[in-house]
Amino acid sequence: MMKKYTETPIPGRDPQRILPSGVGLVCEGGGTRGFFSAGVFEAFMEAGILFPHICGISAGAANALSYISGQRLRSRQIVEHYVPRHEYVSRRNILLHRSMFGYDFIFREIPEEHIFFDWDVLLRQPISYNAGAFDCNTGETVWFGNNDLRGADGRGDLTCVLASCSVPLMSRIVDYKGGKYLDGGIHCSIPIEKSIADGNDFHVVILTRNEGFVKPPMGHEKLIRMFYRKYPKVAEALETRHTVYNQQLELCENLAAQGRAMIIRPQAPVGDSRTSTDVTVLLRLYDEGTDLGRTATSELLKRFA
């Protein structure tokens, strides 16, 4: 029996062109601020281009999947119809699931029951996909790739992306393949070093903060150490997160000044909340991403003609 979805299915499509080897796409996270990145991806899909190497953190890794599967406007439908629901993000979820974000709703119910996810198109793309998660025991960023998106039964599996998205203090630790993981942004918010290490010589960096943003210390050190007393590496990384973030941001800006990177980011401050459910604000952010993505696409096509 054919699966029934509550929304009209959006079939995936293959890209018209994959950019040359050595061009990497770097995607910051940021919770629902990540719908800015989804808007940029919409512009890339509109132009039919796909990057040969994609590395993302948290929401950046998650939103990139609809881009790789070529499902235009899928992320926009999620903003319009599902982000406002309490199952997506709410304090109620903390009581029910011990997590602000409803990860079962986001990673299982939406793609399986509401807006189908085109695994066939995603899994056949000849690109390198990398989702970063924080290993709570070692304190290192672990990278999950294409093979991790395919479960033991051969079907699509989003558990590795869930591990990348599990926001500290707001979410439960994710058990996956013998490890314990939280949001990759704890130690690697902007995965530019991963893109460099994997051999890329030009990087398109999508940020979810405006130019001039400097990440402040998280604070509440004693509370964090108590909360993660069983996982001291998590507390240590959270205490230095702002320093690492600002260093990664500086590296991106230095590369851009050298002509080795292109940065796409919101033009105005977008607020501190990663849990905003204001549809008007999020759609405005999405549309801004699409507009800036179109400009970036024109530059990319000229550069790699």
Name what the model sees in each region.
Residues 1-57, 65-305:
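Patatin-like phospholipase
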